[in-house]
C-alpha cells in the first residue's frame, strides 16, 4: 500500500514538473514588441539632439530628468527650423506583424514658441511615421496654439505596407519638421537685416517620463506571426 502511494505521488510530481517547465522557460523581453507589449515609448536628452523609442515602459535611462527636451533656435536665419527624427534604441529580435484591420495610434506632447506672422517659407508642424528609412505616412498639423502644451493624437489605419515590419531594417521611426518665423524677447516678429534683438523660436518634445500628463508614444496592433 505504501509503495503504491509513493508511486502515485512520484507520477504526480513528474507530471507537474513537465507542465510547469515550458512556462518557466519562457521569458518576455520588455524591450521587444509582442502581442502583450504593444506600446513604443519615447525619450531623449535636454536639447532633443538625441531621442529614441523603447517598448520598455521603464526604459528611460539617459533621458532628460525634466521629462522633455527643447530645441531653441536663435540663429542668423531668425526662424524656428526643426527637423528631428527619433528611432528605436534596439533592433527587433524578430519580424513584427500587425492586425490588418487595426490602427496605429500616435500620440506626442509638444510645445511651440514662434511668431504668429506668416511668410512664404512657413511650414506647419509635420509628423512622419517611418518604417526604417521608408516613409509610411505623414500628416500636417496647422493652426497649433503658441506657448501652450499640446497633445497630438493621430490614428493611422494599418495598410498593406504596414502589416509586417522586418527585423534589422524596418524598425519604426518618427520625424518632426516645422519652419516658422521667430520673434524676439519683446514679442516682435523677426525683421531680417533690421533685427536688433536676438530672434528665434523653440520646439519642445515631451518624453514618456514627463510629469505634465502628456503622452509620447505609439501603440501598434501587434498580433502573433501567421502560421506557415
What residue ranges belong to the model's regions?
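Secretory targeting signatures
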Residues: 1-30, 227-228
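Glycine-centered small-residue hotspots that permit tight backbone geometry or close packing
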Residues: 10, 100-104, 169-171
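Residues that flank catalytic or metal-binding motifs in active/ligand-binding sites
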Residues: 10, 36, 123-125
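Proprotein-processing/basic-patch segments
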Residues: 28-52, 60-103, 107-113, 177-228
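Short coil-to-beta strand junction motifs in C2/discoidin
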Residues: 101, 116-126, 130
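Long, amphipathic alpha-helical coiled-coil/dimerization segments that form elongated scaffolds
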Residues: 112-118, 136
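Aromatic- and Gly/Pro-enriched, solvent-exposed loop/edge beta-strand patches characteristic
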Residues: 124-184
Amino acid at each position: 500500500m505504501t509503495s503504491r502511494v509513493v508511486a502515485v505521488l512520484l507520477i504526480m510530481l513528474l507530471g507537474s514538473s513537465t507542465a510547469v517547465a515550458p512556462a518557466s522557460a519562457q521569458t518576455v523581453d520588455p524591450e521587444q514588441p509582442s502581442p502583450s507589449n504593444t506600446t513604443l515609448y519615447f525619450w531623449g536628452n535636454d536639447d532633443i539632439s538625441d531621442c529614441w523609442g523603447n517598448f520598455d515602459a521603464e526604459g528611460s535611462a539617459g533621458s532628460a530628468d525634466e521629462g522633455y527636451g527643447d530645441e531653441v533656435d536663435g540663429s542668423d536665419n531668425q526662424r524656428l527650423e526643426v527637423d528631428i527624427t527619433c528611432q528605436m534604441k534596439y533592433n527587433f529580435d524578430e519580424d513584427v506583424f500587425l492586425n490588418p484591420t487595426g490602427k496605429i495610434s500616435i500620440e506626442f506632447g509638444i510645445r511651440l514658441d514662434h511668431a504668429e506672422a506668416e511668410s512664404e517659407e512657413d511650414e506647419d508642424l509635420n509628423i512622419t511615421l517611418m518604417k526604417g528609412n521608408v516613409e509610411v505616412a505623414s500628416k500636417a498639423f496647422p493652426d497649433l496654439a503658441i506657448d501652450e502644451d499640446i497633445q497630438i493624437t493621430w490614428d493611422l489605419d494599418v495598410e498593406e505596407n504596414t502589416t509586417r515590419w522586418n527585423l534589422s531594417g524596418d524598425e519604426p521611426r518618427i520625424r518632426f519638421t516645422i519652419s516658422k518665423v521667430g520673434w524676439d524677447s519683446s514679442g516682435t516678429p523677426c525683421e531680417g537685416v533690421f533685427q536688433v534683438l536676438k530672434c528665434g523660436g523653440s520646439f519642445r518634445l515631451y518624453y514618456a517620463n514627463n510629469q505634465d500628463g502628456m503622452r509620447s508614444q505609439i501603440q501598434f496592433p501587434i498580433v502573433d506571426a501567421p502560421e506557415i
